[in-house]
Design a protein with these regions (language model features):
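Long amphipathic alpha-helical segments
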Residues: 86, 111-122
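Short, low-complexity N-terminal intrinsically disordered segments enriched in polar/charged residues
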Residues: 22-65
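Short solvent-exposed beta->alpha transition segments
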Residues: 62-110
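Exposed beta-sheet edge and beta->alpha loop/turn motif
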Residues: 117-191
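Coil residues (strongly favoring Ser/Thr
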Residues: 36, 83-86, 153
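Short, charged, low-hydrophobicity "junction" segments
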Residues: 19-24, 103-114
Length: 191
């Protein structure tokens, strides 16, 4: 009796896995579209960070941009912060990172992202999501009222999640692939 249940359960799991695998395969054309969407979201995040960090941005506008930026991330994502003055890397929730960025003690802040590129191809995970990593370089410049400057360039690795989602449009359920950003890890900081 136990063997029949075990064999039946094994077949059910095997067929369910094959059906799920067939649904989750991404065609090369779809993968190019997903890659393009992921890079677009990374560029959007770079613009949002620049706006949030700028001292010329009004408080209400910065908060509106924070809300928009948070929509790009998977729940629980964290962002790494580093400095030339310490080897420690501190991680904050995305919202806390944006709040700290907005409150930086500089009179002028300039943040630019460049050299954005995939460093790992999307890989299918057991939960059905695809995961990849995009690397960016961030140039940070902060200037105080008395002219003191801090500058660094940080290499950051951004986890990218691609998952199938569902929505209803005109009463019909539609499936689509969406891209969410995950943790942003600091891999190198230099002058």
């Amino acid at each position: 009796m136990l063997n029949i249940r075990s064999i039946t359960l094994l077949f059910v799991m095997m067929f369910a896995g094959m059906a799920a695998s067939a649904q989750d395969n991404i065609s090369p054309e779809r993968k190019r579209a997903i890659d393009s969407l992921a890079l677009e979201k990374i560029r959007d995040l770079g613009r949002y960070i620049s706006i949030i960090g700028s001292k010329e941005t009004e408080f209400s506008e910065a908060n509106r941009v924070i809300d928009r930026a948070l929509e790009l991330f998977a729940p629980g994502s964290e962002m790494g912060v580093s400095s030339l003055y310490s080897s420690d890397i501190k991680y904050y929730t995305v919202r806390k990172y944006f709040e700290r960025l907005m409150a930086l003690n500089y009179d002028r802040v300039n943040i630019q992202w460049y050299n954005i590129q995939y460093v790992s191809d999307l890989e299918l995970q057991p939960d059905g999501r695809y995961v990849g990593v995009i690397t960016i370089y961030q140039r940070f410049e902060g200037t105080s009222a008395d002219g003191l400057q801090y500058r660094d360039t940080t290499k950051k690795d951004i986890t990218v999640y691609v998952e199938r989602k569902r929505t209803q449009i005109a009463g019909r359920e539609i499936e689509f692939w969406d891209v969410l950003l995950g943790d942003i890890r600091v891999s190198e900081t230099r002058a």
